[in-house]
């Protein structure tokens, strides 16, 4: 059981002045009983991640700040427990799983929790093998962590958290990089954990998969609890009711395309790839990919975790060498340096590409003087993405969704012709997703070519004109998006339609 009793927490940065205090949460009363699941949702920056850090003991132990009230785990006050004692009681999956890994191989990572708890070696092997089998991860066993996709890493992180069968689970946006099949699998894992008596606290923006999992929905705003909903009340909310709370859809199968196919895209491709192959070490990841993206067009690149989407993106922008095939831009051969100059990319985990000391400085960091946007244009970009009020903040103090928007802002400010966005809406709330979709539409209208790697049907519906699905390193389908299409069907299609109704 996890209990927060009248908890208020404010982060304190290294600078001890009052102005350095970052927002946290206030007056939180929350109980997650054994065998129950509580969903905490709300806008980016509302305090969801802080709730998870309090529940698993990371705040204030590793995230310093001022704490009042009580946090209890299985009836014991966290203030009187050592960090290892909390870790034995609570299994955690972080927003970015890379920040919780201690091993370089997947099987070792699953076993790590058991080793830390001092289990006998034979029992560790038995439970590790059983967990990998139980969660259907045999194809990911004994793999280098660095060779795994973002979604595959999240699945390994959950396996590590669940290996010891903890009485409590805390998951911070666990589906951020998961494909649709893996999300459905995670739903099954959580239902099983509930049946086994685990108390589960989960924060999410993508809500559709949780409808029959949660026992209570807590909506947060401005660091406090704004509303509590029973599952039946939550399920009864229509799109307007959800939007009023800043929440995303609960019925992904009914999401329809709202962005009509544009007529402003160029008839000739800006980017053309033929027969692309790429390797990681001895393993071939791409097996002869053919792809085109036109100026003025936004293409969604979808597919299962490990299908090769991120590798393809890195090859196209010159960050990873193809082992075979050709890439052309504007009809001419495009070598690595040409692709570097013409493209900008937002990575799956944006924390690896934020370097400046302020949000404002990050937007123009590294740009040559001739290409630095005016102060007015920079302000417009920040305004559009809801970051203007955070211009003076250090990027490290931002929430996951705010960091995502900042990386997108820097990508836009670069003015490059080809923009590649890898999971740009992971960690984004409804408002943030719509803001990014609006900017993508504007960029396409201005003549940019955009390739968006995504599992987000709402985002595809709002701004994409084509859906390309990769499967096992090959293009499985390439389907145009027409207004009012059911996007779920396009993203999961096993073959291309022969006609349009």
Model feature map: region roles:
Residues 144-148, 152, 394-398, 402:
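Conserved ABC ATPase signature
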Residues 161-162, 412:
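ABC ATPase C-loop
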């Amino acid at each position: 059981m996890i209990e927060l009793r009248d908890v208020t927490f404010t982060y304190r940065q290294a600078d001890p002045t009052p102005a350095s205090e970052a927002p946290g949460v206030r007056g939180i009363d929350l109980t997650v009983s054994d065998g129950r699941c509580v969903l905490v949702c709300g806008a980016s920056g509302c305090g969801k991640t802080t709730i998870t850090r309090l529940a698993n003991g990371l705040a204030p132990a590793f995230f310093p700040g001022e704490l009042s009230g009580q946090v209890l785990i299985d009836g014991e006050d966290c203030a009187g427990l050592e960090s290892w004692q909390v870790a034995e009681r609570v299994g955690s999956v972080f927003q970015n799983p890379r920040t919780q890994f201690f091993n370089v191989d997947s099987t070792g990572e699953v076993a790590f929790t058991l080793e830390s708890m001092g289990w006998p070696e034979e029992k560790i092997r038995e439970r590790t093998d059983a967990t990998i089998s139980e969660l259907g991860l045999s194809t990911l066993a004994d793999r280098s962590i660095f060779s795994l996709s973002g979604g595959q890493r999240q699945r390994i992180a959950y396996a590590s958290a669940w290996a010891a069968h903890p009485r409590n689970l805390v998951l911070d946006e666990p589906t951020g990089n998961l494909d649709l099949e893996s999300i459905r699998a995670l739903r099954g894992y959580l239902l099983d954990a509930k049946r086994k008596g685990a108390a589960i606290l989960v924060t999410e923006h993508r809500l559709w998969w949780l409808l029959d999992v949660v026992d209570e929905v807590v909506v947060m705003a401005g660091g406090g609890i704004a509303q509590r909903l029973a599952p039946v009340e939550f399920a009864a909310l229509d799109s307007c009711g959800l939007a009023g709370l800043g929440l995303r859809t609960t019925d992904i199968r009914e999401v329809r395309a709202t962005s009509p196919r544009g007529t402003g895209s160029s008839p000739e491709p800006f980017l053309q790839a033929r027969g692309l192959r790429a390797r990681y070490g001895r393993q071939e990841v791409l097996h002869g990919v053919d792809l085109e993206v036109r100026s003025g067009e936004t293409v969604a690149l979808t597919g299962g975790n490990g299908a090769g989407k991120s590798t393809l993106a890195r090859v196209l922008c010159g960050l990873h060498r193809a082992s075979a095939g050709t890439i052309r831009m504007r009809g001419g051969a495009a070598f690595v340096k040409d692709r570097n100059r013409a493209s900008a990319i937002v990575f799956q985990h944006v924390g690896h590409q934020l370097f400046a000391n302020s949000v404002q400085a990050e937007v123009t960091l590294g740009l040559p003087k001739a290409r630095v946007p005016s102060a007015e244009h920079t302000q417009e970009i920040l305004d559009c993405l809801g970051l203007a009020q955070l211009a003076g903040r250090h990027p490290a103090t931002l929430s996951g969704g705010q960091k995502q928007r900042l990386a997108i802002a820097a990508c836009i400010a670069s003015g490059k012709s080809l923009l590649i966005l890898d999971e740009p809406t992971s960690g984004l709330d409804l408002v943030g997703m719509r803001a990014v979709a609006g900017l993508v539409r504007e960029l396409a209208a201005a003549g940019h070519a955009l390739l968006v790697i995504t599992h987000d049907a709402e985002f595809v519906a709002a701004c994409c004109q084509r859906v390309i699905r990769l499967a096992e390193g090959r293009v499985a389908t390439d389907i145009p998006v027409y207004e009012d299409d059911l996007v779920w069907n396009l993203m999961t299609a096993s073959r291309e339609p022969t006609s349009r109704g």
